[in-house]
């Protein structure tokens, strides 16, 4: 494919219109100039021709990204770089033209940030490899990958495919556009900031070199962005692969392997893309399930959504719970979790009973509502005036009967087990 005149494809009306719609659809925060995504259309109507001419003549200068620090579950910090909405628009237009070119080069076992690919496909591929006798895992952790990408190495790799100097120029400009941290400018000497529309593609272009090396060595692997695992048949092979691939990553790609987090392990000790793995002796196969840390995060969020002090209606809590439940099940539906869903359903009902009990407020109102729900008068008044804590009362048999599973379902609450069974079919 001729890649010597890509800038005109990038600046075509059709491509720019698609980029505009995508940026507006994605919404997103303001960059350093404070412009909102809702203002992009008016801005382009006034300045679009000037921007296009600047891109053609290599005079366009991207603005620095705005640094945003996001806490990680392990206590660390993930640095995001928020470009201006104009730069997001230009990056999106570039990515739309470059992506089909690189899709022809990317490895079939690369699943992150690619069209029509997802984390679930990566998990299913990994399971196939594990169940084919490759049950020793090389789990390689790249230390601050997006913050440490070597610009020269990346541009050299891009230059092997892209021959349009205008495109090469603007991509490099985005890499070195700088970072604003609390109104202080900082040069971006290395890295491709997470948050830009080009960053996922650039990450895959860099790490495709790793994919090619692993393919050349005949290794079984799956990669989702910078999260890569390799599956081999023995512990000795796994340790050898860990040494050799780590050396390649650091010496050839200029990246850093976090040897503290990288490890050789069996599937049972692996956490990958939120999934854990276990061996099912009934079918003599490894299977996936939500990892214990993913379950803990679910429970934490579920408690937040059913917090008794959250000053919203119970119907609103149920609505938000349902959204969260559906999203979580849709992500983990390829895993085995019927028993887990039953347990979590019980936890959710228990939390909602506490919310409803608090919502009734006074003992008199509680007794009145219990009687409406067919609790005998003597039991209703005994429970309403007993003074027990919410947590204990939520386990009370009469309250469980009054605020039953059937009644909570009639309020619109989604059953995790039912939704999981419906989404995963016969699993």
Located regions from the model:
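Non-catalytic, peripheral interaction segments enriched in hydrophobic/basic residues
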Residues: 317-363, 367, 371
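Extended C-terminal regions of large enzymes
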Residues: 351, 356, 360-427
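Conserved polymerase palm-domain catalytic core
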Residues: 54-69, 73, 108-117, 121-271
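Core structural elements
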Residues: 64-68, 73, 175, 315-332
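Phosphate/adenylate-binding "loop-and-lid" substructures adjacent to NTP/NAD/dNTP-binding pockets
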Residues: 30, 34-74
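Electropositive, glycine- and tryptophan-enriched low-complexity nucleic-acid-binding patches
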Residues: 91-92, 96-109
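Non-catalytic, polymerase-adjacent accessory regions of viral genome-replication enzymes
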Residues: 1-45, 49
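A conserved non-catalytic segment of reverse transcriptases
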Residues: 176, 252-320, 324-326
């Amino acid at each position: 494919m001729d890649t010597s005149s890509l800038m005109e494809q990038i600046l075509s009306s059709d491509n720019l219109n698609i980029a505009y719609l995508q940026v507006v659809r994605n919404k997103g925060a303001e960059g350093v100039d404070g412009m909102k995504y809702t203002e992009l259309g008016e801005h382009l109507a006034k300045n679009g021709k000037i921007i296009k001419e600047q891109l053609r003549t290599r005079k366009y200068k991207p603005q620095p990204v705005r640094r945003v620090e996001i806490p990680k579950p392990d206590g660390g910090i993930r640095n995001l770089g928020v470009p201006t909405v104009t730069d997001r628009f230009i990056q999106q237009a570039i990515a739309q033209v470059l992506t089909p070119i690189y899709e022809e080069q990317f490895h079939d076992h690369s699943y992150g940030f690619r069209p029509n690919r997802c984390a679930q496909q990566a998990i299913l591929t990994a399971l196939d490899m594990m169940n084919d006798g490759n049950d020793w895992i090389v789990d390689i952790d790249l230390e601050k990958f997006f913050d440490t990408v070597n610009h020269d190495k990346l541009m050299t790799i891009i230059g092997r495919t892209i021959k349009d100097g205008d495109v090469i120029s603007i991509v490099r400009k985005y890499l070195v556009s700088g970072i604003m941290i609390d109104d202080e400018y900082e040069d971006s000497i290395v890295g491709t900031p997470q948050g830009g529309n080009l960053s996922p593609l650039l990450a895959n272009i860099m790490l495709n070199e790793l994919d090619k090396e692993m393919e050349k060595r005949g290794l079984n692997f799956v990669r989702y962005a910078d999260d890569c695992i390799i599956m081999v048949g023995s512990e000795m092979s796994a340790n050898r692969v860990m040494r050799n691939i780590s050396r390649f990553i650091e010496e050839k790609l200029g990246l850093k392997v976090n040897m503290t987090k990288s490890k050789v392990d069996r599937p049972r000790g692996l956490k990958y893309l939120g999934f854990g793995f276990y061996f099912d002796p009934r079918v003599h196969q490894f299977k996936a399930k939500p990892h214990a840390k993913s379950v803990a995060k679910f429970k934490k969020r579920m408690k937040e959504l059913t917090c008794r002090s959250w000053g919203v209606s119970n119907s609103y809590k149920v609505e938000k719970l349902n959204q969260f439940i559906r999203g979580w099940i849709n992500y983990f539906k390829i895993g085995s979790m019927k028993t887990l869903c039953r347990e979590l359903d019980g936890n959710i009902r228990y939390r909602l009973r506490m919310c409803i009990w608090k919502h009734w407020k006074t003992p008199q109102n509680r007794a009145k509502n219990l009687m409406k729900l067919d609790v005998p008068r003597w039991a209703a008044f005994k429970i309403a005036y007993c003074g027990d804590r919410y947590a204990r009362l939520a386990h009370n048999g009469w309250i469980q009967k009054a605020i039953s599973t059937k009644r909570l379902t009639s309020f619109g609450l989604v059953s995790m087990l039912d939704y999981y069974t419906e989404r995963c079919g016969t699993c």
